[in-house]
Swiss-Prot record:
Location(s) in or outside the cell: Cell membrane
Main subcellular location of this protein, as a coarse class: membrane
Any one Gene Ontology cellular component term annotated for this protein: plasma membrane
Entry's family note: Belongs to the Casparian strip membrane proteins (CASP) family.
Upper classification of the organism: Eukaryota, Viridiplantae, Streptophyta, Embryophyta, Tracheophyta
Record's subunit section: Homodimer and heterodimers.
Summary of the function given for this chain in its UniProt record: Regulates membrane-cell wall junctions and localized cell wall deposition. Required for establishment of the Casparian strip membrane domain (CSD) and the subsequent formation of Casparian strips, a cell wall modification of the root endodermis that determines an apoplastic barrier between the intraorganismal apoplasm and the extraorganismal apoplasm and prevents lateral diffusion.
Keyword Transmembrane: yes
Protein name per UniProt: Casparian strip membrane protein 4
Positions in the Extracellular compartment: 70-98, 153-184
A biological process term (GO) from this entry: cell wall modification
Alphabetical keyword list: Cell membrane, Cell wall biogenesis/degradation, Membrane, Transmembrane, Transmembrane helix
Membrane topology category: Multi-pass membrane protein
Record topology, Cytoplasmic segments: 1-48, 120-131, 206-210
Organism from which the protein derives: Glycine max (Soybean)
Amino acid sequence: MAASKDRENFVYIAKLAEQAERYEEMVESMKNVANLDVELTVEERKKGVAILDFILRLGAITSALGAAATMATSDETLPFFTQFFQFEASYDSFSTFQFFVIAMAFVGGYLVLSLPFSIVTIIRPHAAGPRLFLIILDTVFLTLATSSAAAATAIVYLAHNGNQDSNWLAICNQFGDFCQEISGAVVASFVAVVLFVLLIVMCAVALRNH
């Protein structure tokens, strides 16, 4: 009688142990699934940031090359002239505007060359090397874009308002089309600068969360 009761207790304890083992396996499986979901969420977030990086680079390319092209084609000749003088305004009459065209062309060229690295960050969201490479060069070309845009802005301001202290006369009353073109080029260059800042901030955040 006692042996039968001991056997029943042993079987009962064995069943409890088996159930406890199954419960532990189930809990472990749930933890693995939860961790996998977190990893997928982080990867998807980084991939989304990489896709946005690519889109912003396309926008910056359009702005930079558009600014360079608009400035390079800015030219206006007044319909009247004298025997010895012809009144013309062109970007190559100003060394600052020449620097602007060259700088924005370099910026646009760099952005085009940076697209493959941006694509790599989409394919491999966890890769830190391409992001670090991009953030360094983005900072360099942001400096170039900002300096050229700021210098051109100063000349555009003088073209619109002149400077009485230096006896510099405003020319936009006579060369209206020319001033519209150079003003549009400067605005486009600052759009590129803003997009550069966004790109750098995004890369920095992505590297910080790596």
